[in-house]
Amino acid sequence: MNANPLFPAILLILPGLVQAAIPAATDRAFADFTALPLELLPVLEGVTDRDSAEQSAEKLNALLPRVYDSRTAMTRIETLTPEVKRELLQKYEKDMRTNWGKVYEQIFRLQNRRCYNSLAFFKQFHALCMMLEK
């Protein structure tokens, strides 16, 4: 039999390499999703009247593809082991809750103000809310 002496070592190393690739991609997704509110907040907080809502509509529209991509990447968490899920939540949960909590405060504020009657802003705002709901 012609067995490669490195074969047992490869079998021990390979699972670690395969598992490491999945958390790295998911780790990036979590980092992006956690940081995304820091880009959204200035746009949402800047809306204080109809004129500022009109100006913010374009800025919000520019951010929507990032919201969609980040949200889509986050769905990959379901394919991970419970241990990896737990580790990622320990790493990001506090910042994620804090950052997204601030975004939701702004969403509720803007809903109560009816987006300051700006149709342009309302369209982008509605798209943002729909993306976050799924």
What does each model-identified segment do?
Residues 1-7:
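Bacterial N-terminal signal peptides that target proteins for export
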Residues 20-58, 130-134:
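Immediate post-signal-peptide N-terminus of mature secreted/exported proteins
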